[in-house]
Structure formats: C-alpha cells, structure tokens
Amino acid sequence: MEFRRILVPVVGTEADDEAIRLACRLAKKDKGKIWAVSVITLSRTLPIEAELENEIKKAEAVLEHVETVAEEEDYEVETDLFQSREAGPTIIDEAVEREVDLILMGVTYKTRFGQFSLGTVIPHVLKNAPCRVILYHQIKAD
C-alpha cells in the first residue's frame, strides 16, 4: 500500500502524537505529504465567522506541537486550522479536496454512559471517507 497523501485530524491528545508519528513513518516510505488539521466547532448560536480567540490559540498550539512531533521523526507536516459547525464533514471535505490516500486519526479512550464511545466525528469519517482510514487507539489509562 502506498500512502502519498495523508490527512491527520488532531485535537491535542497523546493519541494525536502517536498518529502523527505513524503518519510520518508511512509517508517517509513513499515520500508522501502529510497535512495535520484542527477543526474548531462552532455552536449554532454563533455566526460561522465568529472569532473564538481562546479556541484559536489552543488549536494553533496543538498544530505547533504536531509540527514539533513531526520534526522529531525528521519529517515535515503542513498544518491548517478550520472553523465549522461540525468537524466530521470538514474532515471529509478536506480529504476530498486534497485527494488523500489515507485519513489517520488518534482515538482516546472515552466513555459515554459508562460505555466506550467513539463520539460522533469518527463514525462520520469512517462512513463517508473517500479513502482508507486508520484509527490509532490510545491505551486506556488506569
């Protein structure tokens, strides 16, 4: 399998770090390109062009950290920040626009009502992705 164009959505978890490391290893093999994207989701009560300074600063810090992790792997990552109502459709739109071969996502151990949960973004991406998807699952901390 060749992965020349890899999209890595990030939110700032340890699983993101490992997903970026894995993306770098996969991309190196084929001299591929990696895009790390962060999506700020806006409440429907706010206008889509609303500027949430704190959220933007957090997302920019996450993207800067991702660049550092990639540098540790001796690879370069291009980063982008988006604002939208829902992260899932934005990730899919970017995957289509960039014609990626792979979406690689870090998954943390989350529970909802006492059960393990993937949330809403990951199922949306799995259902609608125009390419392969790899989930990197972070081990549950005890």
Please place each PLM-identified region on the residue numbering.
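Small/aliphatic-rich secondary-structure junction motif
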Residues: 1-50, 71-73, 78
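Active-site phosphate/pyrophosphate- and oxyanion-stabilizing loops and adjacent acidic/basic residues
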Residues: 24, 92, 123
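Structural beta-alpha unit
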Residues: 1, 71-103, 142
